[in-house]
């Protein structure tokens, strides 16, 4: 299929072209001509000085165009050919500057038309004209489309970016980790993986980065461009690229990767896989990763209030005469459903009944495939005699800078973050004595909805006389979906203690207060 516009060459005169990979070889003299052409059925974009034979060509099938401003774009290709030596390079990029917005628009229209035709040739056209690409990315292979759409829609909204920015523990720790390790950023090339609003990219630029590539797949990329453009002293060293890490190309290797890829239980949303893919694709040998290491912490807990609260949720389905209908056939399913939800909240660390243990995930060494299944053996020693209601989890990450090593934690008792903590509640608690050994397994299996299925087993080993013979006294298991948590952050936490309760930012209006407010409003309306 031949695009009519390429039956003859299309030429555009540019203000300037700067080669990112080799500034000394840039086409600096004016004018510079960009030409779309089709040579031996291969579509090319060629840059050449009008009075010289020097220039280079990009294969359009592997070329991407990124807008930096109204008159400025970055053109990146993973396969370019120099006219001088006819040798291909792995990746090359140029910054294009147009003379006016009319030329800019016409160039972009021609570029998109060529790319559209190339997609039709590589894929298959549906009846409604939609093109299905034959080159599905690795991200698309493992993540279902509906989940990805909702994920990118969520992070494409300023409301949710503001929620993360206002997590001052998170944002402040990142700022400190970067600024305290300026030597790792100064004069270096940085890639911000999942840049969001671009805040980490600007931190890197403030620390003296030579250039920052802010990669963001959601619509937030447009907001990031706007925010960065509003900080002109930083903007000249930051390029926002809209696309997935798995799909894009960069014109150079990175000295530093920076990202905020952590989800609930550290691994939720499966962004850590993208982080290590960026490491494998773009990070130079001996490059730095911020963060560097993550740890999942775990400890058994006792919380009778939480257990009763969850069990009571299913009591609705024990009604035998609900408007003449017997609901009890669904009671067991409802009970199982409530206990299949991990609980996300901030809890009192005094609920923990054994010293915690942790599982290390080294982002510099972990492979993408190792995130598909994470198996953690558990072993604790009970410090009190109690009923264990489940396993509490939280995480921390290390920024291993050359100057300062800084930890960021979501532990109970530490300043609360928007991640809170997470608890897996057993539908059948187990009884333990002080000093009794608790064993088990936490098994995480990744699924295509960008999350994990959690399989938890806890067992209490025999204690006292005869314990040396081994054996298990009690065992309880549960299966949970990390994608569907129970967000309990605003629920009142009642604990028997003589200490004054901690201050809360949540405001609870009781029903009596509501009735009084309604009466006052009615009286006010009557007086008007």
From Swiss-Prot:
EC number(s) on file: 2.1.1.319
GO MF entry, a single one: protein homodimerization activity
Alphabetized UniProt keyword annotations: Acetylation, Chromatin regulator, Cytoplasm, Methyltransferase, Nucleus, S-adenosyl-L-methionine, Transcription, Transcription regulation, Transferase
Compartment(s): Nucleus; Cytoplasm
Reactions accelerated catalytically: L-arginyl-[protein] + 2 S-adenosyl-L-methionine = N(omega),N(omega)-dimethyl-L-arginyl-[protein] + 2 S-adenosyl-L-homocysteine + 2 H(+)
InterPro entries, sorted: Arg_MeTrfase, PRMT_dom, SAM-dependent_MTases_sf
Enzyme superclass (EC): transferase
GO cellular component, one term: cytoplasm
Superkingdom assignment: Eukaryota
Limits of the SAM-dependent MTase PRMT-type domain: 144-459
Active-site residues, Swiss-Prot/TrEMBL: 260, 269
Pfam families reported in the protein's UniProt record: PH_PRMT_N, PrmA, PRMT_C
GO-annotated biological processes: peptidyl-arginine methylation, to asymmetrical-dimethyl arginine; regulation of flower development; vegetative to reproductive phase transition of meristem
Annotated positions of the N-acetylmethionine modification: 1
Family: Belongs to the class I-like SAM-binding methyltransferase superfamily. Protein arginine N-methyltransferase family.
Function: Methylates (mono- and asymmetric dimethylation) the guanidino nitrogens of arginyl residues in several proteins involved in DNA packaging, transcription regulation, and mRNA stability. Recruited to promoters upon gene activation, methylates histone H3 and activates transcription via chromatin remodeling.
PANTHER family in the record: HISTONE-ARGININE METHYLTRANSFERASE 1.4-RELATED, PROTEIN ARGININE N-METHYLTRANSFERASE
Protein name: Probable histone-arginine methyltransferase 1.4
The gene coding this protein: PRMT14
């Amino acid at each position: 299929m031949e695009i009519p516009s390429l039956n003859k060459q299309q030429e555009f005169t540019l203000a300037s072209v700067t080669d990112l990979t080799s500034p000394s070889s840039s086409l600096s003299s004016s004018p510079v001509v960009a030409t779309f052409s089709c040579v031996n059925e291969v579509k090319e974009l060629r840059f050449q000085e009008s009075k010289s034979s020097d220039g280079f060509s990009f294969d359009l099938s592997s070329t991407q165009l990124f807008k930096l401003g109204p008159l400025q774009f970055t053109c990146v290709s993973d396969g370019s050919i120099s006219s001088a030596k006819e040798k291909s390079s792995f990746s090359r990029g140029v910054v294009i500057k147009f003379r006016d917005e009319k030329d800019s628009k016409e160039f972009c229209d021609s570029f998109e038309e060529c790319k559209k035709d190339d997609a039709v040739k590589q894929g298959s056209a549906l009846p409604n004209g939609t093109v299905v690409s034959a080159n599905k990315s690795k991200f698309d292979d493992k993540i279902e489309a509906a989940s990805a759409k909702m994920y990118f829609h969520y992070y494409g909204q300023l409301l949710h970016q503001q929620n993360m920015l206002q997590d001052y523990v998170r944002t402040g720790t990142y700022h400190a980790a970067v600024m305290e390790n300026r030597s790792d950023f100064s004069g270096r090339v940085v890639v911000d993986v999942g840049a969001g609003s671009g805040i980490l990219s600007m931190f890197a630029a403030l620390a003296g980065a030579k250039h920052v590539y802010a990669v963001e797949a959601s619509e937030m990329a447009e907001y990031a461009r706007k925010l960065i453009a509003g900080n002109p002293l930083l903007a000249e060293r930051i390029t926002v690229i809209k696309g997935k890490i798995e799909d894009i190309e960069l014109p150079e290797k990175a000295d530093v990767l920076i990202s905020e890829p952590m989800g609930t239980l550290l691994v939720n949303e499966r962004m850590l896989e993208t982080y290590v893919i960026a490491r494998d694709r773009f990070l130079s040998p001996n490059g730095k990763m911020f963060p560097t290491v993550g740890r999942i912490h775990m400890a058994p807990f006792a919380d009778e209030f939480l257990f009763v609260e969850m069990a009571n949720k299913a009591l609705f389905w024990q009604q035998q005469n609900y408007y003449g209908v017997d609901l009890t056939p669904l009671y067991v399913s409802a009970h199982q459903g409530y206990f299949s939800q991990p609980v996300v909240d901030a809890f009192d660390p005094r609920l923990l009944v054994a010293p915690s243990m942790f599982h290390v995930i080294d982002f510099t060494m972990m492979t993408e495939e190792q995130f598909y299944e994470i198996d953690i053996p558990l072993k604790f020693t009970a410090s009190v005699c109690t009923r264990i209601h489940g396993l509490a989890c939280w995480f921390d990450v290390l920024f291993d800078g050359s100057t300062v090593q800084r930890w960021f934690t979501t532990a109970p008792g530490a300043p609360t973050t928007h991640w809170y903590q997470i608890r897996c509640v057993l539908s059948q608690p187990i009884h333990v004595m002080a000093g009794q050994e608790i064993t088990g397994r936490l098994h995480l299996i990744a699924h295509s909805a960008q999350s994990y299925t959690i399989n938890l087993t806890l067992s209490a080993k025999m204690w006292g006389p005869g314990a040396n013979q081994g054996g298990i006294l009690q065992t309880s298991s549960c299966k949970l979906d990390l994608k569907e948590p129970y967000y309990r952050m605003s629920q009142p936490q009642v604990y028997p203690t003589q200490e004054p309760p901690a201050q809360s930012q949540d405001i609870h209006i009781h029903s009596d207060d509501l009735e009084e407010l309604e009466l006052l409003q009615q009286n006010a309306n009557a007086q008007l």
